[in-house]
């Protein structure tokens, strides 16, 4: 399975780059800027300008880059978006939550989000009660290096006030609803295997933040702050390239 996934990832990356390179000047500009980028980095002054593609603006260590959407994997819980950098880093997102990340010093190869609450459900409860009970759910993930398999973390989702200066561009901040998702102790996870796995990781990650917006009938996470290690945290934002006219 891992080999098939890897082959598909390489194939999609090649197809994406070939398609970009074979089209208009605007697409060639996108290809050039993607090729010039380092892992999750390129000059902030260079931004994608091709509205035919979907982009993700990512900030890691105060450096900005843009990833391109390669494809979406259908899933009963919502599509899994697969985003690529020019150096073949891969970021997977499902309903705004991190589904996987590869190509950095730390990787999350598999992430089970099947128990995560839907944002529509959370917003519905928030509309009925300004102070709803927090949602709790269990995330299971595999981390590399070290082959740490089956790391289970109970997470708690709660509303939060809007940050005073969020790193968001070209979005109406008044339309955003903010949530925090952090790890909490779970007295039910006392099995020997869970104790061993959680002892081996010895790390509680900083809380994640999500900015949610209603777009018609859809609820979309447009911005998030997430960490895969205490010292590896990044921000991402959905980015709309300007509409350009093509012949």
What are these regions (language model features)?
Residues 117-141:
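Surface-exposed helix/loop patches within compact recognition domains
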């Amino acid at each position: 399975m891992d080999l098939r996934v890897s082959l598909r990832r390489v194939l999609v990356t090649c197809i994406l780059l070939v398609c970009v390179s074979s089209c208009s000047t605007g697409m060639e500009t996108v290809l050039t800027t993607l090729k010039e980028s380092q892992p999750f980095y390129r000059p902030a002054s260079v931004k994608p300008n091709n509205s035919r593609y979907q982009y993700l603006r990512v900030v890691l260590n105060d450096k900005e880059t843009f990833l391109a959407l390669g494809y979406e994997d259908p899933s009963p819980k919502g599509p899994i978006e697969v985003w690529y950098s020019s150096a073949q880093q891969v970021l997977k997102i499902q309903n705004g939550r991190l589904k996987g990340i590869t190509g950095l010093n730390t990787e999350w190869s598999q992430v089970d989000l099947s128990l995560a609450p839907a944002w529509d459900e959370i917003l519905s409860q928030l509309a009925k009660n300004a102070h709803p009970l927090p949602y709790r759910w269990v995330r299971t993930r595999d981390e590399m290096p070290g082959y740490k398999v089956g790391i289970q973390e109970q997470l708690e989702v709660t509303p939060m006030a809007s940050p005073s200066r969020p790193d968001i561009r070209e979005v109406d901040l008044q339309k955003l609803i903010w949530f925090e998702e952090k790890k909490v102790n779970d007295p039910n996870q006392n099995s020997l295997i869970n104790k061993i796995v959680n002892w081996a990781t010895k790390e509680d990650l900083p809380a994640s933040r999500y900015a949610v917006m209603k777009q018609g009938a859809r609820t979309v996470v447009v911005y998030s702050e997430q960490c895969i290690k205490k010292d590896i945290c990044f921000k991402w934002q959905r980015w709309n390239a300007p509409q350009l006219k093509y012949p």
